[in-house]
Curated annotation (Swiss-Prot):
This is Small ribosomal subunit protein uS7. One of its GO terms (biological process) is translation. It holds the Pfam family Ribosomal_S7. The lineage of its organism: Bacteria, Pseudomonadati, Thermodesulfobacteriota, Syntrophia, Syntrophales. GO terms for molecular function: rRNA binding; structural constituent of ribosome; tRNA binding.
Length: 156
């Protein structure tokens, strides 16, 4: 972490098909070993499945799913006088999106469907309807913050 000046955030260009920055961020998180075209084909395939299953705009459903998974508050460890406290803190806007995307991908990988396209489509539909593994993850993070509300005065 530099001490002198703030480093400028890298500008992420919108994805070529849907012209959406959030879709581009998701593709960048989904890719493995730099294979972006494969990650794009997986996500676009999931969007095609969403269109068939949900009969709704896949990008709108995707954005709703990410918004439903975004955490508002999380806990951070803070060491005070020999003991470590889980201190609830508000999540920054960019980190909310990053966590939501990460949780959706990790929970999609754990699903029972056969292909990653089907897994992602299922996770998007579930998250958009406020159910599924990624929503459970957000709820557990919020519950942890609620349980440790007594330590909120230990600010960072």
């Amino acid at each position: 972490m530099p001490r002198r000046r703030e480093i400028a955030k890298r500008v992420i260009l919108p994805d070529p098909k849907y012209k959406n920055i959030l879709v581009a961020k998701f593709v960048n998180n989904l890719l493995k070993e730099g294979k972006k075209s494969i990650a794009e084909s997986i996500l676009y395939g999931a969007f095609d499945l969403i269109e068939k299953k949900a009969k709704e705009s896949p990008v709108e459903l995707f954005e709703r799913a990410v918004n439903n998974v975004k955490p508002v508050i999380e806990v951070k460890s803070r060491r005070v006088g020999g003991s470590t406290y889980q201190v609830p803190t508000e999540v920054a806007a960019s980190r909310r999106v990053a966590l939501a995307i990460r949780w959706i991908i990790s929970n999609a990988k754990d699903r029972a469907e056969k292909t990653m396209r089907e897994k992602l489509a299922g996770e998007f539909i579930d998250a958009a309807n406020n159910r599924g593994g990624s929503i459970k993850k957000r709820e557990s993070v919020h519950k942890m913050a609620e349980a440790n509300k007594a330590f909120a005065h230990y600010r960072f």
